[in-house]
């Protein structure tokens, strides 16, 4: 078991990860501006340090564990403005880039064993006002269309270079739209109009998949850097995936292997390299 610092552990996905890592026996330090603020993990015994991670000095001190959990071995970096609609483009870019660089640089200086961090599906071309080149989109389909997506693409490059300088492995997880159980109540509102969720090719990722992918990334036999799309194995829609593509993105090539409600965010690399195997589907709830 390891001592793990989770930045942004008070956020929606961060809380899920903190809870899961503790349940699997790790010692976890949540580093965030604010402590936990809702009932996702009311009884989770996570240590906490407040920090402004856009400040390198605060990032360095917090990631050392301070007197709260000294000797941090692994960093899981989730702290960020979480989407293109949560602030102005300039605020998003400045905050996300500055904090990511500070966290990565501090992790390298402290000599941690590994960094696992939240990249994003937005790197792939969301919101797809420009149709995708093909479907399902894979890790090579890089079209950042917002300052948020650009901050993630440049975060991946920062990870690559800081890994090269330090020798520390960096694993980037390009999460789809994260869902916790309460979010599934909204799914029926998507089903009548396929255009409502075309912006991410009808993708989603369940909280259980997020937790699973982080745990797998902790154990990946990796050197250097790598990035993986992390999504559910299906879409948010009842209609078949090919039918959705033909209606909303006519003419876009769809791989022959796609059938039924298969995801259009390619998770083959995560399956092959990480052993990622997302079992949960919202279809069990309706």
What are these regions (language model features)?
Residues 51-95:
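NAD(P)H-binding glycine-rich loop region in Rossmannoid oxidoreductase-like domains
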């Amino acid at each position: 078991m390891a001592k793990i610092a989770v930045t942004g552990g008070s956020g929606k996905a961060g809380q899920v990860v903190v809870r899961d890592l503790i349940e699997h026996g790790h010692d976890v330090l949540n580093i965030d501006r604010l402590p936990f603020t809702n009932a996702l993990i009311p009884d989770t015994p996570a240590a906490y340090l407040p920090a402004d991670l856009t400040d390198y000095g605060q990032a360095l001190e917090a990631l050392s564990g301070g007197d709260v959990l000294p000797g941090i071995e692994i960093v899981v970096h989730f702290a960020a403005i979480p989407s293109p609609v949560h602030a102005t483009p300039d605020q998003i870019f400045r905050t996300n880039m500055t904090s990511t660089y500070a966290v990565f640089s501090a992790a390298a200086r402290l000599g941690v064993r590994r960094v696992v961090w939240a990249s994003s599906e937005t790197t792939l071309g969301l919101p797809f006002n420009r149709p995708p080149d093909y479907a399902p989109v894979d890790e090579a389909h890089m079209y950042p269309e917002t300052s948020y997506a650009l901050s993630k693409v440049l975060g991946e490059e920062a990870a690559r270079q800081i890994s090269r300088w330090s020798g520390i492995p960096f694993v980037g997880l390009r999460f789809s739209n994260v869902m916790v159980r309460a979010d599934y109540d909204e799914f029926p509102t998507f089903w009548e109009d396929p255009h409502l969720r075309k912006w991410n090719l009808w993708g989603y990722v369940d909280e259980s998949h997020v937790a699973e992918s982080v745990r797998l990334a902790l154990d990946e036999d990796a050197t250097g850097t790598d990035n993986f799309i992390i999504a559910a194995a299906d879409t948010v829609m009842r209609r078949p995936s090919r039918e959705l593509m033909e209606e909303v993105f006519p003419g876009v090539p769809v791989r022959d292997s796609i059938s039924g409600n298969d995801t259009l965010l390619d998770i083959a690399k995560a399956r092959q390299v990480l052993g990622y195997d997302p079992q949960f589907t919202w279809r069990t709830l309706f």
